[in-house]
Amino acid sequence: MSSGRSPHTHSPTGQVSADPPAWTSPVAWCTLVLVAVFGIGLDLWSKDWAFENVAERPVVLDRDEILADSDWRPPPHEGIEVLPFGLLDFDLVMNHGAVFGIGQDQRTIFIVFTITAVTLALVIFAVGTRARSHALHVGIALILAGGIGNLYDRILFGAVRDFLHMLPRWDLPFSMNWPNGSTGVFPWVFNVADMLLLLGMAIIVFMTGTRKEPVQSDDSISQKNDRILDSKNELGG
């Protein structure tokens, strides 16, 4: 039995009320904070574990020493084969650049950029998303986690701790090489924070591309219906 009520809430102007902004929603904030905290914790824990266990001895990082030598590296070590067929190794690297080692020796710029990006992401979450845009909130939280995880390393150690090396023993065919001279299929070493950043961006791009059309107001719907009826009447006449 129908109650006769409309399933939508209407504003005084006849506009069908949309999802409220995310900043008004406790659920949205909880999603953002919980996912971000989990991601940051996972990233920092994985880095700590790797630098304590991958080499023969725990690698102690001295911030002043690393800042004084832009080519500072952990002591030589064999690394750990994680997946067979040379798919993944754990190999310790200190990255003075951005994601996958891009832009070396620009520490201050990356710190300022990361702080700006984190602030912008929070603003976009608060006023640029709706309360029920849960997937977007997860994507933004993953970006925050990745950015903050690497920012922590830049401030505390002077560089970012990386240890994930995909396809370490796979070479490019036909003696090809990358601009830096590397012949590996994937010569970059990365970390969990980098993965979180890329996953977050992928979620946001996907959700933005599949976003539904906004709900129309009662007035615009009524005007469309009137135009359709007028067209039918003209055809019938």
Predicted regions and their residues:
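Alpha-helical transmembrane bundles and membrane-interface segments of multipass inner-membrane proteins
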Residues: 1-237
